Structures are given as structure tokens and as C-alpha cells.
Amino acid sequence: MASKDAQNQRRGLPGFLPGAPDPDQSLPASSNPGNQAWQLSLPLPSSFLPTVSLPPGLEYLSQLDLIIIHQQVELLGMILGTETSNKYEIKNSLGQRIYFAVEESICFNRTFCSTLRSCTLRITDNSGREVITVNRPLRCNSCWCPCYLQELEIQAPPGTIVGYVTQKWDPFLPKFTIQNANKEDILKIVGPCVTCGCFGDVDFEVKTINEKLTIGKISKYWSGFVNDVFTNADNFGIHVPADLDVTVKAAMIGACFLFDFMFFEHSLAGL
């Protein structure tokens, strides 16, 4: 009796797939070699196949269609009038912080290269783990010098390149391209002819490669006269489809940092 119960328990083990043969019954030998080859070539169940995983730390980005970036006010820079390392809070639509970004650069570059300085921005999650690294080399920022324009390298996780943000030469409009790890164009970003804001928001449209369809925008929010004149603290919003690839969203976060350096870092530029 005990042996029969043990056999029944073995037959009901949860590890067997529905419709799988009884392990106590031997499979009939096939006399046709073709049938044996067909059995060996059967695909594995989907539960055993490797799944495409997101870069660690970017899982939360897959749920967002609005990402808010808030630059922290540096009191020391306000008092002394010096350029300090930028710090940013990255939040969801509810204002909850999901990431924190800190600029790494040397004082010499901040003093003498100003907004053109080379730097590295390290983005960490709320546990302090670095999830995105943004590298910015020293480049030009002029429509009169189209050979050495701005470029960012996006790594997620650190050490793994997932994309680039590159400036494209245009005599009238600020234009940028988001590229994948192979430097293939994915999306374009087109800004307005005048980026000073004039007491309002400044929108950079996110478009398809042919620039015929707008799928989102990156907005620099006007923070008010006092804040924009006396501080360099800026607020940005990234509006994109929620199902957009998380590595592209990470590149857009890097693009916000680049726009801040290029167009809004000086106090009067935000007006």
C-alpha cells in the first residue's frame, strides 16, 4: 500500500509539465529514425528559454511616460558666484525621487571651460547603486565649427555602452540624434530657434528619423524670474511613450543634462 502511495506522489510532482509522460512508464522505442530526430528537435518550453532582461536599475523606467529632472540649488555657488558641480534629482510624475545624479569634474574645467567642460554624471538609485553613467568629453558648441560638436556616451549599467546623444550641425535650429550602441540613428531631437524661454517653457521635440512624426518632447520648465536670474537651478520634463525602450529613456535623461549645460547653465539664459 505504501509503495502505491509513493508512486502516486511521484506522478503528482509539480515539476512535470501538463501532458508529460508518466515517469514510471517507459516510452515505446520508435523504429523510424526520422521520428527520433523530430523528437530531439522539439523546441524547449517557453519557461526554459532565456528572456530579454532590462539593464539592472532601469526596470522602473519601463513604466514611466513622464520623467521630471530637478537641478538642486547650490548655495555656495550662489554666494561666491563660482561654478560648482551640478546635482539633479530625477523624479516620477508624482514627484517621488527615483534617481539622483551627481556631476564629477575638476575645478579647473568648471572655472576655465565653463559650460563646455568635460565631465561624468553618475546616476544612482535610491539604494545608492550606480545604474547609469553619462560621459561628456570636451567639445565645441558653435554652428561655425561643425566638425567637433557635442556628444554624450550613455552607459547602463556602468561599463556597458547603450547609446549616444550627438549634436548635428544646423545653421538655424539645435538638432540632436539619439543613437544606439552601434551608433545607428534611432530618434532625433529638434529644439526651437530661440532657447532663451522668454518667461515660458522651452520645448525640444522628439521626432522620428525622417522628422515627420513627433513622439514626445523634452521641456525646460520656466522656474520663475527670481529663480532663473539668481540661480542656475533648472527643471526639465521628458514626455515619451511609456513603452519606449528604457535605454532610449536613459539617453534622453542624458540629453537633458546636455541641454542644461549648452543652453541654460548661465543665469540669464533661462529667461
From Swiss-Prot:
InterPro entries, sorted: Scramblase, Tubby-like_C
SUPFAM superfamilies: Tubby C-terminal domain-like
GO molecular function: phospholipid scramblase activity
UniProt region (Disordered), positions on chain: 1-33
UniProt cross-references to Pfam families, sorted A to Z: Scramblase
GO process terms (BP): plasma membrane phospholipid scrambling
Polar residues bias (residue ranges): 1-10
Region (Proline-rich domain (PRD)): 1-45
An example Gene Ontology CC term for this record: plasma membrane
Domain of life: Eukaryota
UniProt comment concerning the protein's domains: The N-terminal proline-rich domain (PRD) is required for phospholipid scramblase activity.
Family: Belongs to the phospholipid scramblase family.
Protein name as annotated: Phospholipid scramblase family member 5
Gene: PLSCR5
